C-alpha cells in the first residue's frame, strides 16, 4: 500500500463542470490528463490543482502583500493533499514585450553577455583595428622610445566632434592655469572670452605641457602624463612639435589611429535593454517605423487634385494645397498633373520639403499679392503627428503611412556601435544571437578552440552554462530558433517548450509541473525528444502532469486520468485513471481511439477541386527560399513540415496578409513575394483561430453568432410585448430599460474583500436572471428571455424548431459539436477549441458564395480524437460548398483527410523554406521526400 505522501489526492473537485470528483495522481510520475474538449481537463489541472498550489504559496505572504496580489480565490474542492510547489507552463504567449527574446527568456543571452564582457576582443568602429590599452608606466616608456630627443606637446582631449561655443570650458581651463588649447588641429592661446562657432563640430585638446624628451627619470614627463590622463579621463595625446603628427595613448581601450576610447566592458554593455548597450536610434528594438512612400502614393496614375497623395485626400481650398500648387507652378506643372508625370526632384520637394520658402499668390477683389511661407514637406508633417503624444487620433491617422524597417544605425543588431565592436572568433554578440540554436552550439565549440589559455579559463564555466541550456532547447525540438527571435512571434507550443527547456535548465527538484499540450506545433519527428525531456524532468525528482491528446504521449505516460464521458454538462467525471496498459483494455472514447477500435475514417475519394488555383510566386519572407506555391481551389489543403520549416511564414505571414490587404485594406504588410495569380477566383478570406470570441462575461454564444438579435425580435413581436410597447432594447441586458439595474445586467454583484479576493454573489433582486420583473413577464412557449439564455444549444434546437431564422443559426452550433454549451454562457469560460468551432458555426450559418478561403493554424490544439472528427466533418462541409480550406497542421488525423498537401522542409530555420512535396496524401507518401512523407505512409498503412 502506498504511503499518503507518495500521491497527490484531490477530493470533491467541483470547479466549473467537474462533478464532485476524486482523483489520485502518483508523485514522481509523468501523468497525462486527457478527455474531450470541454470535458474538464483544464478545470482539474489548472483551475483546481494549480490554483490551490498557487493559493497556498500566496497565503504565506503578509496580509499587506496579499492586498496587491490576485489569485487567492480558493478553488471549489473539498481537500487536496500531497501538493509540492507548483509551476504551470501554459500555451499562451503571455509576453507581448518586443524586448523579450528566446535568449532573454532562457537566460542564454545573459551568459552570452557575460562571455563577451570577459573574453571578447574590442575593435575600433572607425578603423576596424584592434583596440589597445596601456598602463601609465607603459605610456611613459613608449614616449621615451618614440620621441627621444624630440620636442613634444602633451595634450588631454576634452571635446570629441561635438557642436558648441565652449566659452565656459575655455574660461575654466584658463582659471586652472592652462595657456594653450588645440582646436581643430590648430594650437591657440586661451584668450579671455574665447568662443567657437556653436553650429560646427569641434575637437578640443588642452595643452598640458610642452617639453623635450630626455631620459628615463624625467619627473616632469611623468607628472605631465599623469595630469593629461586625469584631465582626458584616461586618454591623452602626444604631438610632435616639428612634424605636427599626433598619437593617442590611453589607460582605457583605445583605437591607436583615431583615438576613440571605450570604457571597460561590463555585461550591461551588451544588453539592448540597458541604456549602456542599446542602440540610440531604435532604443534596442532593432527596428524603427519610417514613413513609406508607397503608402502615401499607392496609385501614381492619379493626380494630387484627385487624391493621389493619400494624406492630403482630394483637393480642398486649404493652405497645404496652395503650397503644393505653388511648388508645381514653379515647374510649369499643376495639381491635375498625374503623379507619375512629376519629375523626381519636384516629388521629393513635395514629400520632404524645400529649403527656400514657397511663394504663394493671394488674390482679393481683382488684386493679388505674393507672400512667402516655409514648407517642410508631408513626411515631416506625418512624423510630427506620430511624435505628438497629446493627439492620439492624429497618431493613429499617421501610423497607416509607416512601415517597420531595420534600424539604419545598428542594422537590426539592437546594440550601439561600441557594443557591436566586440568580437569573439570574428562575430559580434548580435551575429551570434542571430544563429540558429544548432549552429550556435557548433560556433561555441569552434570559438572555445580559438581562445587563448587565459580566456579559456575565464570562459570555461560560462560556456558550460550556455551549452547545458542550448542542449535542453535542442531536446524539445527548437533547434531552428535563434536567440534574437522575439518571444511575441513564437507560437503557443514554441513558447511553452521554451519555458519547459528553461525549467529543465533550472534543475529544480520536488516540484509539480503542469503543462498544457506541449506537443502542439511539434512534428512527429521531434515528439520523441519532447517525451524524453518530460521524462528527464520527472527523473530529477519532480511530478509532471500534462494535459494532452497526443497518442504517443499517452502511451509513454506512467499514469493516465481520462475526464469525460462527454463535454460541458456531459463531462466532468473521471471515466478512467490508471496505467496506459490498463487504459487500452477500457471501453472509453479515448481508449477506443488508442487501441484502434475507433478511427477517423479516410475519405472515399480526394476532391479534384474547381480547376482554378491561387499561385504565389517568389515568396522569400524569413527562411522561405524564393518559393512558388500553388493553392488549388475547392479543396481541403494541409500545409505540413517540421517545426520552423516555413509553414506559418507562407500561410500566416504571406498568403493571408496579401488577401486581407486586397479584400479588407488591412494594414498588415505581407512578407516579401514577387507576385500572386488567381486572386480573382476567391471573394474573401476568413482566419478561424482559437482566440477568445469575447473578452468580458457579457459576451456569449448567442450574442457572438447574432442569434440573440433574432431571439429579441421574436420576444418584441409577442402580444404581451406589443401591448406594453417594448422595443428590442428592452430584452438586452447591456442597456437600461429591461435589465436589472441593481446588478447592471450582470446577474451578480462583486463584493470587495480588501486583502481577500473579491467575491461574486448572485444579485439579490434578479437572482442571477439579469432582467427586471416586468421584462421576465413576457414569455414565449412559457419561457422568459432569461430562461432561453439558460438553455443549452441542444435544448434550444428543440425549443425553436418552428422559427427558421433562429433554428438555422443554433443548429450550426449543434453541428460543430457544441450542443452542450448554454446560449448565455460567458465567452470567457469557453476553451480555445470551443471558440474556434463557434467561429466555424458562425461561418456555416452565413449564406456564402462558395468562393471563400478559410485559413486555420493548428486547429487541433486542445482537441481530442473525437473533437477532431467533428471539426473535420465541419470543414469538409465548407469545402463541399465550393470553398477552399487551408490548414497548417502536424496531426496525422487531419493530414490523412487532405485533398492536397504542401509539405515544407527539409529542416527548420535556415535549413527549411523549400517546398518538398505536393499532392494527395498518397502522392506525398510515395514521393519519399521530406520527413512528413514517411509518417504519412505509416499512418495510411495503419488505417487501411
Q: What is the meaning of each model-derived region?
A:
Residues 1-944:
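Conserved phosphate-binding elements of NTP-dependent enzyme cores
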Amino acid at each position: 500500500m502506498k504511503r499518503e505522501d507518495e500521491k497527490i489526492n484531490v477530493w470533491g473537485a467541483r470547479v466549473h463542470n467537474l462533478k464532485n470528483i476524486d482523483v489520485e495522481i502518483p508523485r514522481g510520475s509523468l501523468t497525462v490528463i486527457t478527455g474531450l474538449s470541454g470535458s474538464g481537463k483544464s478545470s482539474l489541472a489548472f483551475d483546481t490543482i494549480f490554483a490551490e498550489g498557487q493559493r497556498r504559496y500566496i497565503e504565506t505572504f503578509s496580509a499587506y502583500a496579499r492586498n496587491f496580489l490576485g489569485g487567492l480565490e480558493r478553488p471549489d474542492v473539498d481537500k487536496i493533499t500531497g501538493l509540492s510547489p507548483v509551476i504551470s507552463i501554459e500555451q499562451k504567449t503571455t509576453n507581448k514585450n518586443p524586448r523579450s527574446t528566446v535568449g532573454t527568456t532562457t537566460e542564454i543571452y545573459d551568459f552570452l553577455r557575460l562571455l563577451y564582457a570577459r573574453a571578447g576582443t574590442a575593435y575600433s568602429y572607425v578603423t576596424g583595428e584592434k583596440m589597445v590599452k596601456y598602463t601609465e608606466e607603459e605610456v611613459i616608456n613608449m614616449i621615451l622610445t618614440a620621441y627621444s630627443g624630440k620636442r613634444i606637446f602633451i595634450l588631454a582631449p576634452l571635446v570629441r566632434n561635438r557642436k558648441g561655443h565652449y566659452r565656459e570650458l575655455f574660461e575654466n581651463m584658463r582659471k586652472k592655469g592652462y595657456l594653450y588649447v588645440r582646436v581643430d588641429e590648430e594650437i591657440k592661446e586661451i584668450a579671455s572670452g574665447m568662443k567657437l562657432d556653436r553650429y560646427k563640430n569641434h575637437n578640443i585638446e588642452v595643452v598640458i605641457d610642452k617639453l623635450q624628451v630626455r631620459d628615463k627619470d624625467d619627473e616632469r614627463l611623468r607628472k605631465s602624463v599623469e595630469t593629461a590622463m586625469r584631465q582626458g579621463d584616461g586618454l591623452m595625446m602626444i604631438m610632435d612639435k616639428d612634424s605636427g603628427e599626433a598619437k593617442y595613448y590611453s589607460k582605457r581601450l583605445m583605437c591607436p589611429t583615431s583615438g576613440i576610447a571605450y570604457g571597460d566592458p561590463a555585461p550591461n554593455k551588451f544588453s539592448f535593454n540597458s541604456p549602456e548597450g542599446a542602440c540610440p536610434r531604435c532604443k534596442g528594438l532593432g527596428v524603427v517605423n519610417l514613413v513609406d512612400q508607397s503608402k502615401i502614393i499607392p496609385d501614381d496614375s492619379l493626380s494630387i487634385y484627385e487624391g493621389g497623395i493619400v494624406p492630403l485626400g482630394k483637393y480642398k481650398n486649404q493652405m497645404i494645397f496652395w503650397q503644393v500648387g505653388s511648388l508645381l507652378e514653379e515647374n510649369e506643372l499643376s495639381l491635375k498633373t498625374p503623379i507619375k508625370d512629376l519629375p523626381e526632384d519636384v516629388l521629393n520637394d513635395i514629400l520632404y520639403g524645400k529649403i527656400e520658402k514657397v511663394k504663394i499668390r493671394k488674390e482679393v477683389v481683382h488684386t493679388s499679392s505674393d507672400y512667402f511661407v516655409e514648407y517642410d514637406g508631408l513626411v515631416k508633417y506625418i512624423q510630427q503627428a506620430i511624435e505628438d503624444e497629446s493627439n492620439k487620433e492624429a497618431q493613429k491617422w499617421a501610423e497607416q503611412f509607416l512601415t517597420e524597417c531595420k534600424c539604419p544605425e545598428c542594422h537590426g543588431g539592437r546594440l550601439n556601435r561600441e557594443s557591436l565592436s566586440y568580437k569573439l572568433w570574428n562575430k559580434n554578440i548580435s551575429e551570434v544571437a542571430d544563429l540558429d540554436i544548432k549552429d550556435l552550439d557548433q560556433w561555441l565549440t569552434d570559438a572555445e578552440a580559438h581562445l587563448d589559455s587565459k580566456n579559456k579559463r575565464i570562459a570555461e564555466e560560462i560556456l558550460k552554462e550556455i551549452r547545458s541550456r542550448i542542449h535542453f532547447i535542442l531536446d524539445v525540438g527548437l533547434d531552428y530558433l535563434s536567440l534574437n527571435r522575439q518571444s511575441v512571434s513564437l507560437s503557443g507550443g514554441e513558447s511553452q517548450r521554451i519555458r519547459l527547456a528553461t525549467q529543465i535548465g533550472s534543475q529544480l527538484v520536488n516540484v509539480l509541473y503542469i503543462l498544457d499540450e506541449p506537443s502542439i506545433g511539434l512534428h512527429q519527428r521531434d515528439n520523441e525528444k519532447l517525451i524524453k525531456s518530460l521524462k528527464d524532468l520527472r527523473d530529477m525528482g519532480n511530478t509532471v502532469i500534462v494535459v494532452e491528446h497526443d497518442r504517443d504521449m499517452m502511451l509513454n505516460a506512467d499514469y493516465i486520468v481520462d475526464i469525460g464521458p462527454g463535454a460541458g454538462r456531459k463531462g466532468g467525471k473521471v471515466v478512467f485513471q490508471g496505467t496506459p496498459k490498463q487504459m487500452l483494455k477500457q471501453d472509453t472514447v479515448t481508449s477506443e481511439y488508442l487501441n484502434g477500435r475507433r478511427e477517423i475514417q479516410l475519405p472515399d475519394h480526394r476532391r479534384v477541386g474547381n480547376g482554378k488555383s491561387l499561385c504565389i510566386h517568389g515568396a522569400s519572407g524569413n527562411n522561405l527560399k524564393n518559393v512558388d506555391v500553388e493553392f488549388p481551389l475547392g479543396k481541403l489543403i494541409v500545409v505540413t513540415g517540421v517545426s520552423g520549416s516555413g509553414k506559418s511564414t507562407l500561410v500566416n505571414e504571406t498568403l493571408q496578409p496579401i488577401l486581407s490587404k486586397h479584400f479588407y485594406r488591412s494594414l498588415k504588410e505581407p512578407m516579401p513575394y514577387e507576385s500572386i495569380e488567381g486572386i480573382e477566383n476567391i471573394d474573401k478570406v476568413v482566419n478561424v483561430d482559437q482566440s477568445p470570441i469575447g473578452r468580458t462575461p457579457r459576451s456569449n454564444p448567442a450574442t457572438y453568432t447574432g442569434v440573440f438579435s433574432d431571439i429579441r425580435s421574436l420576444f418584441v413581436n409577442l402580444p404581451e410585448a406589443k401591448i406594453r410597447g417594448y422595443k428590442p432594447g428592452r430584452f438586452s441586458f447591456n442597456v437600461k430599460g429591461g435589465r436589472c439595474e441593481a446588478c447592471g445586467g450582470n446577474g451578480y454583484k462583486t463584493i470587495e474583500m480588501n486583502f481577500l479576493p473579491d467575491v461574486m454573489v448572485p444579485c439579490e433582486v434578479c437572482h442571477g436572471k439579469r432582467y427586471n420583473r416586468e421584462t421576465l413577464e413576457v414569455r414565449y412557449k412559457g419561457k422568459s428571455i432569461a430562461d432561453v439564455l439558460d438553455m443549452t444549444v441542444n435544448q434550444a434546437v428543440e425549443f425553436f424548431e418552428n422559427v427558421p431564422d433562429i433554428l438555422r443559426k443554433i443548429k450550426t452550433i449543434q453541428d460543430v459539436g457544441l450542443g452542450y454549451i448554454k446560449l448565455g454562457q460567458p465567452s470567457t469560460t469557453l476553451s480555445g477549441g470551443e471558440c474556434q468551432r463557434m467561429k466555424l458555426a458562425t461561418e456555416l450559418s452565413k449564406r456564402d458564395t462558395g468562393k471563400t478561403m478559410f485559413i486555420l493554424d493548428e486547429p487541433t490544439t486542445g482537441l481530442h480524437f473525437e473533437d477532431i472528427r467533428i471539426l473535420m466533418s465541419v470543414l469538409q462541409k465548407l469545402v463541399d460548398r465550393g470553398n477552399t480550406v487551408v490548414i497548417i497542421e502536424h496531426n496525422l488525423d487531419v493530414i490523412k483527410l487532405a485533398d492536397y498537401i504542401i509539405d515544407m522542409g527539409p529542416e527548420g530555420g535556415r535549413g527549411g523554406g523549400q517546398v518538398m512535396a505536393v499532392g494527395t496524401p498518397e502522392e506525398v507518401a510515395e514521393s519519399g521526400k521530406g520527413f512528413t512523407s514517411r509518417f504519412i505512409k505509416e499512418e495510411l498503412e495503419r488505417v487501411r
